[in-house]
Amino acid sequence: MTENTPGTSAPERFDPATADTRWQRVWDEKQSFRADDSSTKPRSYVLEMFPYPSGRIHIGHVRNYTMGDVLARYKRMRGFEVLHPMGWDAFGMPAENAAMEKGVHPGGWTRDNIANMKAQLKRLGFALDWSREIATCEPEYYGQEQALFLDLYAAGLVYRKESTVNWDPVDMTVLANEQVIDGRGWRSGALVEKRKLNQWFLKITDFADELLEGLSTLDKWPEKVRVMQENWIGKSQGLQFRFDLSNGETVEVYTTRPDTIFGASFVAVAPDHPIAQGVAAINCEAANFIALCKKGGTTAAELETAEKLGFDTGIGARHPLTGKYLPVYIANFVLMEYGTGAIMAVPGHDQRDFDFATKYALPILRVVAADAADADKPFAGEAEAGDGVLVNSGFLDGMNVADAKAAVIVRAESEGWGEGKTVWRLRDWGVSRQRYWGTPIPFIHCEVCGVVPVPKKHLPVTLPEDVSFDVPGNPLDRHPTWKHVDCPQCGHPARRETDTLDTFVDSSWYFLRFASQPEDRPFDPEEIKRWLPVEQYIGGIEHAILHLLYARFWTRALARIGKVEVTEPFGSLFTQGMVTHETYERRNPENGQPIFFSPGEVERTGEGATLKVDGAPVEIGRVIKMSKSKKNVVDPDEIVAKYGADAIRWFMLSDSPPERDLPWSEAGIEGCARFVQRLWRLFGQYDAAATGEDKALDRKAHQTVHAVASDIEALGFNKAVARIYELTGAVEKAAPSASRSDAIRKLLLLVAPMMPHLAEEAYARFGSSLIADAAWPEVDPALLVDDEVIVAVQVKGKLRDTLTVAKGTPKEDLERLALASEKVQRALEGAEVKKVIVVPDRLVNLVA
């Protein structure tokens, strides 16, 4: 920076509209944020989860991308070669829904939305490398995905089988268990049905141990996310054993609590278990019950909370230790996909079994108690799942739970009726989807050769453009020509696979394509080695299981087949909070239902609010997540147009810790806009010719630079904002001096990652370079240590005065200064000081 001259004097007010447009154009022209693969600088890969192109950026996106942008800009200032890309998770059902509702092609609808959202992102001034932009709906991307899918197939990690699936009868597609919410499709809301279809699967279960053990290395991930993945993978160790049945058959069950085997009072099988199906074949009531079960929830979480229903098959299961016969039920809460599809039910020590036994008047036996004397203690209306000692359990009596588990497994294995076994909750990933707008699965079905992979030289298998969405279902299946093709092996007429890949496949490797984009292969392994893992990944907690687990699996699968060396894609993960807003509503006088109004329709009046059109009051509701249905949304474009990009960026970083929800406030954004102007005025006071020293301000400035750097690196943006406010106030109060001008310069550099347009506009008055290319201010380590400290003085435990003294002042001097204080003497009221406790540099406590 050079001295401000009359020729470079600043206008009185900062004009966001002009500055935003100017500097965004300059950054584009100079390609300021394009990552250089040939750079020798240390590398930093900052990535926010890429959005689905719905057509509009919402305020939650702004918060997410602002956080990543601040970190990316900061890393550039610290000398890193930064990769900060953006793209579009562009396949999926909403585009097909739009095609059906509006008569537009999914591709055109999606690309128009991308153009709109890209323009919105640019207006916010994000330091993105647009040269690496990808859209998963483009053949350049999904063709490489098809190649990777074939590589995994060749390695035995992709297979096809008939399986029971969750079928959405409205969207007419298969849903993963995670996409079924309360028994309904996550997009359509339709009740999900069970069907059997031939499906393509990825063998994620081959990586269950790796994925579980790998969580222990992710110490920069939120504990909550790691626990969620651990539970989803669901490793359990227990006993698998056989019950001999009264009809001459046997049933295998799996239990994680073999210690409670003497407490079993019934056996339950899943509705689609072979025993259940056999009973249904000869019993209409059983068949009707199974049909009823298929209409209910399909996930473990849903079945856990649903009413427990059962059907007595009339079959008995002989207990392997007591010889008694237990009734066998078909139960709606047993999943065929977990364990063996049959369970040993112990009502006394499992709440689900307790509820079922209570409903059907089955015995509830106590086999674990806090003390042996409690063997006959009745249950207090619920199961007891805690630890204790074994009771009413024959040879297990008196053992603790762990020893009893081991003893039962030893007994079962020695007598040949069971064996210890590890079971996983995780299931192979079904990736077939019966829809058009997705990546075509690159296989051909030939009556002579069977299932044949498409040769890589014929990739990409592209989607046909001439499709119709007049009726639900998969247009690819109905297409008159696209699916008809000659077999690449024998030349006979064959047909293409008409299923497309689950869109979560697209987002399971996009971070690799951002890092390297050769035309002839998915990526260059050497570039992946240099850029990966992503240093900082930012996105919502809602992706803890689906996207994040699948991305971890995909990376490990590619590592196993030698495509990459990295095994964990994201070194550090941050899950940001939502942006929330109060609702405004009235009750419909006819039906009592709420009628919601947008913030723009409402006028706030003190503690209340009125509707602008009629002046009548509206009810101010709770502060909740912004949603279109509640109309409590704020349009980022309107905010940028009114206040400028820097004001909304600053608001997103202020007040709330970034992992917590951020309540939107009109007063808050107005305050941010005022602070932008306040800084502008302060930057205009820089004077390179100023002389004189202000040691306290020097120390404050250097300490703030150091602290803000630490805050940004820890993603503690609200703390960084608070420190910048403090330094701003200190500089404003300081008299003109060289120290003050230096502090102004440092302050300008500090806000550059957060308010880049304001910073560029101010920086331009002092030279020709961009602040986007400037270095982070240096700090003097000697100034990071305070020479003076404030020591609290207490009398009888209450604060009465403070002493500002040199650091390291001896105890005797602190005691003398404390006793000399007039405030202390007044507090003592002439009483004799019996004891003085001194904590150097912190506290003097006088006991009278």
Curated annotation (Swiss-Prot):
Keyword terms of this UniProt record: Aminoacyl-tRNA synthetase, ATP-binding, Cytoplasm, Ligase, Nucleotide-binding, Protein biosynthesis
Keyword Ligase appears in the UniProt entry: yes
GO biological process: leucyl-tRNA aminoacylation
One of the record's GO molecular function terms: ATP binding
Highest taxon, organism lineage: Bacteria
GO cellular component: cytosol
Locations listed in the record: Cytoplasm
Enzyme type, top EC level: ligase
Entry binding sites for ATP: 628
Disulfide bonds: none
Primary location group: cytoplasm
Region of interest: Disordered: 1-21
Span(s) of short sequence motif 'KMSKS' region: 625-629
InterPro entries reported for this sequence: aa-tRNA-synth_I_CS (IPR001412), aa-tRNA-synth_Ia (IPR002300), Leu-tRNA-ligase (IPR002302), Leu_tRNA-synth_edit (IPR025709), M/V/L/I-tRNA-synth_anticd-bd (IPR013155), Methionyl/Leucyl_tRNA_Synth (IPR015413), Rossmann-like_a/b/a_fold (IPR014729), tRNAsynth_Ia_anticodon-bd (IPR009080)
Positions of short motif 'HIGH' region: 51-61
Catalytic activity: tRNA(Leu) + L-leucine + ATP = L-leucyl-tRNA(Leu) + AMP + diphosphate
A Pfam family assignment: tRNA-synt_1_2
HAMAP family: Leu_tRNA_synth_B (MF_00049_B)
Name recorded for this polypeptide: Leucine--tRNA ligase
Organism this protein belongs to: Novosphingobium aromaticivorans (strain ATCC 700278 / DSM 12444 / CCUG 56034 / CIP 105152 / NBRC 16084 / F199)
Lineage of source species: Bacteria, Pseudomonadati, Pseudomonadota, Alphaproteobacteria, Sphingomonadales
